[in-house]
Amino acid sequence: MTIKLIVGLANPGAEYAATRHNAGAWYVDLLADRFRAPLKEEAKFFGYTSRINVNGNDVRLLVPTTFMNLSGKAVAAMATFYRIAPDEILVAHDELDLPPGVAKFKLGGGHGGHNGLKDIISKLGNNPNFHRLRLGIGHPGDKNKVVGFVLGKPPVSEQKLIDEAVDEAARCTEIWLQDGLTKATNRLHSFKAQ
Protein backbone atom coordinates (compact mmCIF):
# COMPACT_ATOMS: atom_id res chain seq x y z
CA MET A 1 0.00 0.00 0.00
CA THR A 2 1.40 3.33 -0.98
CA ILE A 3 0.31 6.94 -1.15
CA LYS A 4 -0.48 8.36 -4.59
CA LEU A 5 -2.06 11.69 -3.63
CA ILE A 6 -1.04 14.10 -0.86
CA VAL A 7 -3.44 16.96 -0.15
CA GLY A 8 -2.79 20.06 1.96
CA LEU A 9 -5.98 21.70 3.18
CA ALA A 10 -6.22 25.49 3.11
CA ASN A 11 -8.35 28.50 2.39
CA PRO A 12 -7.32 30.38 -0.78
CA GLY A 13 -5.90 33.89 -0.91
CA ALA A 14 -3.13 35.88 0.71
CA GLU A 15 -5.27 36.88 3.71
CA TYR A 16 -5.50 33.23 4.83
CA ALA A 17 -1.99 32.04 3.88
CA ALA A 18 -0.49 32.45 7.37
CA THR A 19 -3.55 31.30 9.37
CA ARG A 20 -3.58 28.11 11.44
CA HIS A 21 -6.26 26.56 9.19
CA ASN A 22 -3.69 26.50 6.36
CA ALA A 23 -1.16 24.28 8.14
CA GLY A 24 -1.86 21.43 5.70
CA ALA A 25 -0.85 23.63 2.77
CA TRP A 26 2.40 24.61 4.54
CA TYR A 27 3.32 20.92 4.59
CA VAL A 28 2.54 20.33 0.89
CA ASP A 29 4.41 23.53 -0.03
CA LEU A 30 7.44 22.18 1.84
CA LEU A 31 7.29 18.82 0.02
CA ALA A 32 7.02 20.64 -3.32
CA ASP A 33 10.07 22.77 -2.43
CA ARG A 34 12.07 19.81 -1.20
CA PHE A 35 11.51 17.88 -4.42
CA ARG A 36 11.88 21.00 -6.61
CA ALA A 37 8.41 20.44 -8.01
CA PRO A 38 6.66 23.83 -7.96
CA LEU A 39 2.89 23.80 -7.55
CA LYS A 40 0.95 25.12 -10.55
CA GLU A 41 -2.71 26.02 -10.72
CA GLU A 42 -4.76 23.42 -12.57
CA ALA A 43 -8.38 24.48 -13.07
CA LYS A 44 -9.79 21.00 -13.72
CA PHE A 45 -8.59 19.91 -10.26
CA PHE A 46 -9.70 23.12 -8.50
CA GLY A 47 -6.27 23.59 -6.99
CA TYR A 48 -2.51 23.87 -7.23
CA THR A 49 -0.91 20.59 -8.23
CA SER A 50 2.48 19.03 -8.70
CA ARG A 51 4.06 15.61 -9.02
CA ILE A 52 7.00 14.17 -7.12
CA ASN A 53 8.87 10.91 -7.26
CA VAL A 54 9.87 9.44 -3.92
CA ASN A 55 11.98 6.31 -4.17
CA GLY A 56 10.16 5.20 -7.33
CA ASN A 57 6.73 6.17 -5.98
CA ASP A 58 4.81 8.55 -8.23
CA VAL A 59 2.95 10.96 -5.94
CA ARG A 60 0.63 13.84 -6.85
CA LEU A 61 0.46 16.92 -4.66
CA LEU A 62 -2.68 19.06 -4.32
CA VAL A 63 -3.57 22.26 -2.49
CA PRO A 64 -7.24 23.03 -3.26
CA THR A 65 -8.12 26.58 -4.29
CA THR A 66 -11.71 26.06 -3.16
CA PHE A 67 -12.65 27.31 0.28
CA MET A 68 -11.99 24.81 3.07
CA ASN A 69 -15.58 23.56 3.27
CA LEU A 70 -15.47 22.62 -0.45
CA SER A 71 -12.11 20.79 -0.37
CA GLY A 72 -13.73 17.50 -1.38
CA LYS A 73 -14.49 18.86 -4.84
CA ALA A 74 -10.76 19.14 -5.61
CA VAL A 75 -9.79 15.85 -3.94
CA ALA A 76 -12.56 13.88 -5.67
CA ALA A 77 -11.72 15.43 -9.07
CA MET A 78 -8.09 14.36 -8.84
CA ALA A 79 -8.78 10.95 -7.28
CA THR A 80 -11.35 10.15 -9.98
CA PHE A 81 -9.16 11.34 -12.86
CA TYR A 82 -6.10 9.34 -11.76
CA ARG A 83 -8.10 6.40 -10.33
CA ILE A 84 -6.69 6.88 -6.85
CA ALA A 85 -8.45 4.97 -4.06
CA PRO A 86 -9.26 6.63 -0.70
CA ASP A 87 -6.63 4.54 1.12
CA GLU A 88 -3.99 5.88 -1.31
CA ILE A 89 -4.72 9.48 -0.24
CA LEU A 90 -3.01 11.41 2.57
CA VAL A 91 -4.80 14.59 3.68
CA ALA A 92 -2.82 17.05 5.81
CA HIS A 93 -4.88 19.32 8.05
CA ASP A 94 -4.70 21.51 11.13
CA GLU A 95 -5.64 19.65 14.34
CA LEU A 96 -7.11 21.43 17.37
CA ASP A 97 -6.70 18.36 19.61
CA LEU A 98 -2.89 18.28 19.32
CA PRO A 99 -0.54 20.98 20.65
CA PRO A 100 1.70 23.01 18.33
CA GLY A 101 4.88 21.05 17.62
CA VAL A 102 3.16 17.66 17.42
CA ALA A 103 1.97 15.81 14.30
CA LYS A 104 0.37 12.38 13.89
CA PHE A 105 -0.58 10.04 11.06
CA LYS A 106 -4.03 8.47 11.22
CA LEU A 107 -6.12 6.25 8.93
CA GLY A 108 -9.86 6.83 8.76
CA GLY A 109 -12.07 8.10 11.54
CA GLY A 110 -14.51 10.99 11.73
CA HIS A 111 -14.03 14.61 10.77
CA GLY A 112 -13.88 16.01 14.32
CA GLY A 113 -15.78 19.08 13.19
CA HIS A 114 -13.17 19.92 10.53
CA ASN A 115 -15.10 21.25 7.52
CA GLY A 116 -12.41 20.26 5.04
CA LEU A 117 -12.40 16.63 6.20
CA LYS A 118 -16.20 16.63 6.35
CA ASP A 119 -16.47 17.62 2.68
CA ILE A 120 -13.78 15.16 1.55
CA ILE A 121 -15.54 12.26 3.30
CA SER A 122 -18.79 13.30 1.63
CA LYS A 123 -17.31 13.73 -1.88
CA LEU A 124 -15.49 10.37 -1.66
CA GLY A 125 -18.92 8.74 -1.33
CA ASN A 126 -19.07 8.97 2.47
CA ASN A 127 -15.80 7.04 2.69
CA PRO A 128 -13.64 8.20 5.62
CA ASN A 129 -10.93 5.60 5.02
CA PHE A 130 -8.18 7.88 3.76
CA HIS A 131 -4.98 8.70 5.63
CA ARG A 132 -4.65 11.95 7.54
CA LEU A 133 -1.68 13.93 8.74
CA ARG A 134 -2.88 15.81 11.82
CA LEU A 135 -0.78 18.94 12.38
CA GLY A 136 -1.23 20.23 15.91
CA ILE A 137 -2.25 23.88 16.29
CA GLY A 138 -3.58 23.73 19.87
CA HIS A 139 -7.04 24.74 21.10
CA PRO A 140 -8.30 28.14 22.27
CA GLY A 141 -9.89 26.46 25.31
CA ASP A 142 -13.44 27.52 24.43
CA LYS A 143 -15.35 25.95 21.56
CA ASN A 144 -17.03 29.29 20.81
CA LYS A 145 -13.60 30.73 19.97
CA VAL A 146 -12.55 28.00 17.54
CA VAL A 147 -13.48 29.81 14.29
CA GLY A 148 -11.52 32.94 15.19
CA PHE A 149 -8.65 30.78 16.42
CA VAL A 150 -8.20 28.65 13.28
CA LEU A 151 -8.56 31.75 11.08
CA GLY A 152 -5.99 33.59 13.19
CA LYS A 153 -2.22 33.65 12.83
CA PRO A 154 -0.22 31.84 15.51
CA PRO A 155 2.24 33.88 17.58
CA VAL A 156 5.89 33.53 16.55
CA SER A 157 6.66 31.03 19.33
CA GLU A 158 3.84 28.70 18.21
CA GLN A 159 4.61 29.20 14.52
CA LYS A 160 8.15 27.95 15.16
CA LEU A 161 6.81 24.77 16.80
CA ILE A 162 4.29 24.15 14.00
CA ASP A 163 7.00 24.71 11.36
CA GLU A 164 9.28 22.18 13.06
CA ALA A 165 6.46 19.61 13.18
CA VAL A 166 5.66 20.25 9.50
CA ASP A 167 9.33 19.71 8.66
CA GLU A 168 9.44 16.45 10.63
CA ALA A 169 6.17 15.31 9.02
CA ALA A 170 7.68 15.89 5.56
CA ARG A 171 10.73 13.78 6.52
CA CYS A 172 8.46 11.05 7.90
CA THR A 173 6.39 11.09 4.70
CA GLU A 174 9.56 10.28 2.77
CA ILE A 175 10.32 7.48 5.26
CA TRP A 176 6.78 6.14 4.75
CA LEU A 177 7.26 6.01 0.98
CA GLN A 178 10.67 4.34 1.33
CA ASP A 179 10.41 2.11 4.40
CA GLY A 180 6.71 1.82 5.18
CA LEU A 181 4.10 3.41 7.41
CA THR A 182 5.07 1.65 10.66
CA LYS A 183 8.59 3.07 10.67
CA ALA A 184 7.33 6.53 9.68
CA THR A 185 4.61 6.50 12.34
CA ASN A 186 6.97 5.38 15.10
CA ARG A 187 9.31 8.25 14.31
CA LEU A 188 6.66 10.95 13.86
CA HIS A 189 4.67 9.96 16.94
CA SER A 190 7.74 10.21 19.16
CA PHE A 191 8.51 13.74 17.93
CA LYS A 192 7.68 16.92 19.81
CA ALA A 193 9.17 20.26 18.83
CA GLN A 194 10.74 22.16 21.73
From Swiss-Prot:
Its EC number is 3.1.1.29. It is found in: Cytoplasm. GO terms for molecular function: peptidyl-tRNA hydrolase activity; tRNA binding. It is an enzyme of class 3 (hydrolase). TRNA binds at residues 16, 67, 69, 115. It catalyses: an N-acyl-L-alpha-aminoacyl-tRNA + H2O = an N-acyl-L-amino acid + a tRNA + H(+). The active site is at residue 21. One of its GO terms (biological process) is protein quality control for misfolded or incompletely synthesized proteins. Its main location: cytoplasm. GO terms for cellular component: cytoplasm. The keyword Nuclease does not apply. SUPFAM superfamilies: Peptidyl-tRNA hydrolase-like (SSF53178). The record marks 94 as: Stabilizes the basic form of H active site to accept a proton. The keyword Cytoplasm applies. The record marks 11 as: Discriminates between blocked and unblocked aminoacyl-tRNA. Keywords: Cytoplasm, Hydrolase, RNA-binding, tRNA-binding. InterPro entries: Pept_tRNA_hydro, Pept_tRNA_hydro_CS, Pept_tRNA_hydro_sf. Hydrolyzes ribosome-free peptidyl-tRNAs (with 1 or more amino acids incorporated), which drop off the ribosome during protein synthesis, or as a result of ribosome stalling. Belongs to the PTH family. Monomer. This is Peptidyl-tRNA hydrolase. It comes from Cronobacter sakazakii (strain ATCC BAA-894). The gene is pth.
